[in-house]
Every structure is written in C-alpha cells, then in structure tokens.
Amino acid sequence: MKNILKVFNTMILALIIIIATFSNTANAADSGTLNYEVYKYNTNDTSIANDYFNKPAKYIKKNGKLYVQITVNHSHWITGMSIEGHKERIISKNTAKDERTSEFEVSKLNGKIDGKIDVYIDEKVNGKPFKYDHHYNITYKFNGPSDVAGANAPGKDDKNSASGSDKGSDGATTGQSESNSSNKDKVENPQTNAGTPAYIYAIPVASLALLIAITLFVRKKSKGNVE
C-alpha cells in the first residue's frame, strides 16, 4: 500500500511540473520584445520621427490578437498616433521623462506596417521660437518573430492622406516634411490565426483523467478489489 501511495504522489508531482512547464512555455511564446524602425512613408528611408520612438517595443498576443506597446519620448509633441488605422490606447505615462507608452492592435510582428502620426510644436526649440503642425503617414519596420500569427484585420482610418508642407514659424519650409501620399498601399492579408495550440487545453484534461483513474485504482486496491 505504501508503495502505491509513493507512486501516486510521484505521478501527481510529475503532472503538476508538466502542466506548469507547458503553461510557462505558452505564455513565453505569446509575449516578448521586438526591435523596429520608423521610415518615411512607403520608403526605406529613416524618418525624422524615428528618434522620438524608444526601442525596443513589446508585443503581446491575447485572445488571438496581436498587440504592440510602443513608448515615445517628447510625448507632448506627439498629439496622436495610429497603426493600420487602429488608434493608440495609452497604457502608461511618465510626465517627468515626457514619455508615454501606447498599445496598438497589429496584424503582424515582422515586416512593414503603415501608421500615422500627429505632431504639434509651439515653443522654443534650441532657444528659438518654433511652430510645427503636421499630420503625416509613416511606415513601421518591425523586426519581430514571423511565426507568431494573429487574427487581426487592419482597421479603417478616417484620414488617408497627410497634410501639406511643413512650415516653421517664419513661414519657411522646414525641410523636415515626410513623404505624403493620398493613395493607400494594399495591406498584406494577415495570417489566419490557429489560436492557442490544442495541446495546451488537452494536457489538463488528460491529467485530470489520469488523476481520476489513479484515485479509483488506489481505492480499489485498498479494498482488495483489484485482481
């Protein structure tokens, strides 16, 4: 009887370890960090806005959808952002550092993704009065894992084109304008999401069934009903 109980306890401990290991593996695969760059819209040229984006970003997969969390500095200059038509959801702010972290729903973690940014500056920059008010398209180049798929579909943005020339407070063009376009590029079809692997759900069920079987066996053995 003592030997049976030892085997029973050992198997229970093993099941707990297996379940914990698979759960941690699944969670680890559903979040992480990714490096990225901000390009001028529909080009491979680095945008002037790139320096205002802290790297790396963080990605999360939840409920079958992909999200990236991006932190910007000079936060009060950046009055609005969107990625694939999905507006930012601010999740944290650091007033002292003038930073904020925003979450966006995305269709993939690797490759180019279109976004928009609104910038408004009306203060002294390098000791001189400076005024800058612009809304323009940009392209994010994500360098994250390509094997993490989501079911996300690009959202619809109410503005498809950027505004006119960037101008400083003296009315002269600043030379910092981004490439503007009124035509939307086609967005790649997101990969079909397979959801959480089936074995993640199967393991607890199989473990429970095994636990019940062992319990019944031990009870029968203690009563002398096992042949």
Curated annotation (Swiss-Prot):
The residues that the entry says bind heme are 47-48, 132, 136
* Keyword annotations from UniProtKB, A to Z: Cell wall, Heme, Iron, Metal-binding, Peptidoglycan-anchor, Secreted, Signal
Composition bias type Polar residues, residue spans:
173-182
> According to the record, what induces this protein's expression?
Repressed by fur in the presence of iron.
Query: Domain of life, per the record?
Result: Bacteria
Provide the leader sequence positions. 1-28
Span of the annotated motif NPQTN sorting signal: 189-193
Q: The NEAT domain covers which part of the protein? A: 29-150
Q: Which residues form a coiled coil?
A: none
Q: PROSITE patterns from the entry?
A: NEAT
Modification Pentaglycyl murein peptidoglycan amidated threonine occurs at? 192
GO CC annotations on file: extracellular region; peptidoglycan-based cell wall
Q: Which GO terms describe its biological process?
A: heme transport
Q: Where is the composition biased (Low complexity)?
A: 161-172
Residue ranges annotated as propeptide are 193-227
Q: Which GO terms describe its molecular function?
A: hemoglobin binding; metal ion binding
Q: Where is this region: Disordered?
A: 149-191
Membrane topology note:
Peptidoglycan-anchor
Q: Which CDD domains match?
A: NEAT
Give the comment on domains.
Answer: The NEAT domain binds Fe(3+) heme iron. Reduction of the high-spin Fe(3+) heme iron to high-spin Fe(2+) results in loss of the heme from the binding site of the protein due to the absence of a proximal histidine.
Q: Which PANTHER family match?
A: IRON-REGULATED SURFACE DETERMINANT PROTEIN C (PTHR37824:SF1)
Protein family according to the UniProt entry: Belongs to the IsdC family.
Give a short account of what the protein does. Answer: Involved in heme (porphyrin) scavenging. Binds hemoglobin and almost exclusively free-base protoporphyrin IX. Probably has a role as the central conduit of the isd heme uptake system, i.e. mediates the transfer of the iron-containing nutrient from IsdABH to the membrane translocation system IsdDEF. Hemin-free IsdC (apo-IsdC) acquires hemin from hemin-containing IsdA (holo-IsdA) probably through the activated holo-IsdA-apo-IsdC complex and due to the higher affinity of apo-IsdC for the cofactor. The reaction is reversible.
Give the record's subunit note.
Monomer. Interacts with IsdA.
Q: What is the protein's name according to its record?
A: Iron-regulated surface determinant protein C
